[in-house]
From Swiss-Prot:
Family listed: Belongs to the NrdR family.
Domain ATP-cone: from-to ranges: 48-138
Positions annotated as zinc finger (unnamed): 3-33
Cofactor: Zn(2+)
Gene name in the database record: nrdR
Highest taxon of source: Bacteria
InterPro entries: ATP-cone_dom (IPR005144), NrdR-like_N (IPR055173), RNR_NrdR-like (IPR003796)
Protein name, per record: Transcriptional repressor NrdR
Alphabetized Pfam families for the sequence: ATP-cone, Zn_ribbon_NrdR
BP term (GO), one: negative regulation of DNA-templated transcription
Alphabetic keyword roster: ATP-binding, DNA-binding, Metal-binding, Nucleotide-binding, Repressor, Transcription, Transcription regulation, Zinc, Zinc-finger
Length: 150
């Protein structure tokens, strides 16, 4: 690697995992000027693109996913660790697929399935917004399906 000070070649003095364990911190020394500097090495993850219902495309945003789940779980006995794990699992699954573009419908369905396992009320809350229930009959049908599956 080139030295940021003089452009000369450098050598690695020390390598160790960074604090987040997702990068490698390397301490280097320039062979030409002798100055030391630190570099960080991370795996480059290609962006995940969400295809919205209207065809628009936008980068995946974990915070949006987390916000939706948090709203569904509001005032429910669902620990934050469970909510974060749910978001992590969904994001990991999406990124591990070979597709770089994911329809928003797929994300919504995965969230609903995960919430169904975690908390029935949170599931129905999320489903009512996600599926845009028009009346009480649609709401009742979803509740009946939930009760049958338990």
């Amino acid at each position: 690697m080139k030295c940021p000070f003089c452009g000369g070649e450098s050598r690695v003095l020390e390598s160790r995992p960074a604090s987040d364990e997702e990068a490698v911190r390397r301490r280097r020394e320039c062979l030409a000027c002798g100055r030391r500097f630190t570099t960080m090495e991370r795996v480059e993850v290609p962006p995940l693109i969400v295809v919205k219902k209207d065809g628009r495309r936008e980068p995946f945003n974990r915070d949006k996913l987390l916000t939706g789940v948090l709203k569904a779980c509001e005032k429910r006995p669902v620990p934050m660790e469970v909510i974060e794990k749910l978001a992590d699992d969904i994001e990991r699954d999406l990124r591990s697929s070979l597709d770089r573009e994911v329809p928003s419908v797929v994300i919504g369905e995965r969230v609903m399935e995960a919430l169904r396992q975690v908390d029935g009320v949170a599931y129905v809350r999320f489903a009512s917004v996600y599926r845009e229930f028009k009346d009480l009959n649609e709401f009742r049908e979803q509740l009946e399906q939930l009760l049958k599956s338990r």
